[in-house]
C-alpha cells in the first residue's frame, strides 16, 4: 500500500464521517440521536425537521460517496482503490468518530458510490428502489430492495471484480444496518413514509 493510497483511504473515511444530519439538526436545536429512530440520516431528519433539511442531508450524503471515489481518481489511484475509497466513505458515514462511532445507515452515501462507479447500475437501482418505496410507503423497504437489486445486477452484469466486490459489500452492509427495520416490518410497527415523529 502506497502512502497516497493510505491517505486517500483515510480522507475517504473522514469525508464519509461528516455527520451532516446530526450537525444540521444541532444547528436547529435538535439532537437527532434522541428523536425518532435515533438514526443520523435523511429519513430521520425528514420526520423530525421536514423536507428541506432532509433534502440537504440526502444530497450531502450522496456527495460524500461521489467525492471519495473522485478523490482516489484525482490522486491517480487504480479503479480498485477508487472502489475501496467509496466503501470507506460509507463505513465512515455509518461509524463516525464525530458521533462516538455511530451514524446513519449508509443508503445515500452507498448510492453516491455506486452511481459514480457505475452510473447505469446506480440509476437503475435508484429508480426501482424509489418505486418500491412509493408502492409500500416504507423508506426502509425501498432501501433494502435497492440493496438486493444492486447486488443482483452487479452479479449478472459484466463488471470488474473490484466494482462487484464493493457493491456486494455495500449491499450486505446496508441490509445489516436495516436489521431493526426488518424486525419492525415483520411486526407491523415500522413507520410509513410521511409519518412524523410523535
UniProtKB/Swiss-Prot annotation:
Stated name of the protein: Glycerol-3-phosphate acyltransferase 1
HAMAP family registered for this protein in UniProt: PlsY (MF_01043)
Record field: catalytic activity: an acyl phosphate + sn-glycerol 3-phosphate = a 1-acyl-sn-glycero-3-phosphate + phosphate
Cell compartment(s), UniProt: Cell membrane
A Pfam family annotated for this UniProt entry: G3P_acyltransf
The protein's assembly and partners: Probably interacts with PlsX.
Residues in coiled coil: none
Principal EC category: transferase
Function summary: Catalyzes the transfer of an acyl group from acyl-phosphate (acyl-PO(4)) to glycerol-3-phosphate (G3P) to form lysophosphatidic acid (LPA). This enzyme utilizes acyl-phosphate as fatty acyl donor, but not acyl-CoA or acyl-ACP.
Enzyme Commission numbers on file: 2.3.1.275
Any GO CC annotation of this UniProt entry: plasma membrane
Entry keyword Lipid biosynthesis: yes
Key words of the record: Cell membrane, Lipid biosynthesis, Lipid metabolism, Membrane, Phospholipid biosynthesis, Phospholipid metabolism, Transferase, Transmembrane, Transmembrane helix
Pathway(s) where this gene product acts: Lipid metabolism; phospholipid metabolism
Alphabetical list of InterPro entries matching this protein: G3P_acylTferase_PlsY
Family: Belongs to the PlsY family.
GO BP annotations, alphabetical order: phospholipid biosynthetic process
Topology relative to the membrane: Multi-pass membrane protein
One function term, GO molecular function aspect: acyl-phosphate glycerol-3-phosphate acyltransferase activity
Amino acid at each position: 500500500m502506497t502512502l497516497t493510497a493510505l491517505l486517500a483511504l483515510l480522507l475517504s473515511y473522514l469525508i464519509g464521517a461528516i455527520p451532516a444530519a446530526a450537525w444540521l439538526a444541532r444547528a436547529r436545536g435538535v439532537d437527532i440521536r434522541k428523536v425518532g429512530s435515533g438514526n443520523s440520516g435523511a429519513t430521520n431528519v425528514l420526520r423530525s425537521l421536514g423536507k428541506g433539511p432532509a433534502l440537504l442531508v440526502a444530497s450531502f450524503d450522496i456527495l460524500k460517496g461521489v467525492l471519495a471515489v473522485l478523490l482516489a481518481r484525482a490522486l491517480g489511484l487504480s479503479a480498485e482503490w477508487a472502489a475501496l475509497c467509496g466503501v470507506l466513505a460509507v463505513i465512515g458515514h455509518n461509524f463516525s468518530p464525530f458521533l462516538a462511532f455511530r451514524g446513519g445507515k449508509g443508503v445515500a452515501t452507498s448510492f453516491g458510490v455506486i452511481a459514480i462507479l457505475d452510473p447505469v447500475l446506480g440509476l437503475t437501482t435508484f429508480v426501482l428502489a424509489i418505486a418500491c418505496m412509493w408502492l409500500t410507503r416504507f423508506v426502509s423497504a425501498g432501501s433494502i430492495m435497492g440493496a438486493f437489486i444492486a447486488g443482483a445486477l452487479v452479479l449478472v452484469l459484466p463488471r470488474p471484480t473490484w466494482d462487484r466486490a464493493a457493491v456486494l459489500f455495500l449491499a450486505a452492509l446496508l441490509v445489516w444496518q436495516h436489521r431493526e427495520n426488518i424486525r419492525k416490518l415483520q411486526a407491523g410497527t415500522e413507520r410509513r413514509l410521511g409519518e412524523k415523529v410523535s
